[in-house]
């Protein structure tokens, strides 16, 4: 497996522009030195050395002969060699001089750029305050080498932030209907656009607008929109209006997702920053400290943090393909495939929203009441589930936001997961046979769904695994799934991929549509970082029943109440623990399981291991025992106790079924953990026909004396109750997912955030000391000192956790890690490099 290129190192802890100029100047200084060192002493330099103006004038005045020129060339060469030796002895002084020259040449900010300068100063101060956490290659900062399946590389030459147009509509008195500290109501003319950064609720009052593929008509419903800087910004466009205009109202929302910035640096500076020019215009009548959860942007230069912002525009060929596919209605069964970073997920999201667009209330046309089925076969970048899973979802409403804003559909009113399978890896190539069986089982579930929703179309999102064995799997799916269409997201081939797909589509009598890939070249988060953000969002998201939209909590994993379950004894709640991949010694199961992400899988049959004969059921327990165990599980607002699964699953079990499952369990010698392993060399996975993944869990601790596991999981109690009512057993599957380093560093980042908030309060209190009594001010100062000491002690304790090191110096490694957080990632779009290695792409 090839290692990806390291990020380009910063030469000095200055701004990105100054650092780039310093590198360029240093390269110019070292370039003639390297040339001189590599040349033989008897040959003249390949490029004539630069002469002084005096020498040039003298040469023009007097036409010297060849002997003089040769002597002068030799003298110039000797001077070049001596300068190279001097630079070789003092490389640090040369770099320092270059940085000093760059600092001197950097002009001070003009008066009109005060907001931008203040934002840059604020960013530098925040970077100085934050320590860099490292666990091997860095906690909280995902190392490049860790993302073996990634499709981006660090940008060697980071492009300068360009003034990119975003909104065509300019707000003024004529199109602003109303505005206050939370709401903005505006009119948009036909074919005009408006782009907002942040998260907000959108209400269409008049006219028809398009947003991320969906056409929204006037209705009383509010649509939640998430527009972070990590992805291209959604564009609100008026497609039809009353008197040529549409009217929308945008409201601030309190989803709590912004609180995740206190737990991870990946969530910092992804929402709206300081007030833009449009914000200042619409907030004239309110306090200057008022801030909405969204900002209107005319161009990318309006952003106070100078981020790489781009609008989410739809290609014309994409639009025509979406219109053509949507005309098939309930007969649509489309497979979307293509190379990595080609826009498969974006196109799938646009098509999904277009099919789920609500019909206008004034028309009597056919309305899609059966929803849309979404079969996600990409375990590395799933849309509605955390990583490592393939699933079938039934959706009833459009979604506006990246995957980390809807990492789960549990208890959601907009959709549900019909069935899910835990692959245990971010790439299907780890076990293609299991992957294909999981896809076929999900397709069978879709056919069963058609009995209740006959007009439900199907969208299949295939991963970027399109070469080698992945191409064979894709062509087999095209021939076997009974599709209506196949979409390939690349016009540049290669032919060795397009031709087999075309032959498979022709054999299945399915049209193949080829579309251009996405125009985006740079992203601000790598695929590994986006996976980390999605999993962290998954564990911190909740969906209260009394509200429509989800909420996020900033409670760290260490302070979250765990689910406690016995793994041995008469009240055993976990039937087995499986480790996918290569076989490990039972003595190492404790180390492999502790602190890992595991899949919580409901086993529907005792013969659920692939290759075994099917059995009638997992147990012979009565329905009454199962219901009793489920009622104990779902005790409201109290600890979920999975130990009562014993009552649900241990009844009059058939001897053959019990012995069949128990014979596969190996008890570890020291911890007595139920190690489930079947196979030779690698463990056979669970059969998709007899298993269903309920979600992910984090193994917080293993209490060996009491034989208990502490699990942190967002799986609703109702989902566990349903599994137990049906007599299913619970198996934990340890796969090859990314290590949850974000969970280890949450306490540290939370402690630093608390300290910063306290420092802000202290600074605010000091400004008010002149108007207060001296004795009261002294008491407040003592209290503030005590609080500061407690917060520092909290930071110290949070930084002393295992597998984490806090670096507080200003070393080169510190600066490189800080620069890594701000860098861009360049997408690799070459479909085929002429190599047989699939890991390169």
Swiss-Prot record:
Bias class Acidic residues marks the residues at: 115-133
What start and end residues bound the annotated signal peptide? none
Location in the cell? Nucleus, Nucleolus
GO MF annotations for this entry? ATP binding; polynucleotide 5'-hydroxyl-kinase activity
Where does this protein have compositionally biased stretches of type Low complexity? 16-28, 92-105
Primary residence? nucleus
Q: Name one GO cellular component term.
A: nucleus
Q: Which UniProt keywords apply?
A: ATP-binding, Kinase, Nucleotide-binding, Nucleus, rRNA processing, Transferase
- Pfam family membership, one: CLP1_P
Stated EC number for the protein is 2.7.1.-
Q: Does the keyword Transferase apply?
A: yes
Enumerate the InterPro entries for this protein. Clp1/Grc3, CLP1_P, P-loop_NTPase
Question: Which residue intervals are annotated with compositional bias (Basic residues) in the record?
Answer: 812-831
Question: Origin, by domain of life?
Answer: Eukaryota
Task: List the GO biological process terms.
Answer: cleavage in ITS2 between 5.8S rRNA and LSU-rRNA of tricistronic rRNA transcript (SSU-rRNA, 5.8S rRNA, LSU-rRNA); rRNA processing
Give positions of region: Disordered. 1-133, 812-841
Per UniProt, ATP binds at: 338-345
What task does this protein carry out?
A: Polynucleotide 5'-kinase involved in rRNA processing.
Provide the family line.
Answer: Belongs to the Clp1 family. NOL9/GRC3 subfamily.
- What is the designated name of this protein? Polynucleotide 5'-hydroxyl-kinase grc3
Lineage of producing organism: Eukaryota, Fungi, Dikarya, Ascomycota, Pezizomycotina
- The primary gene name is grc3
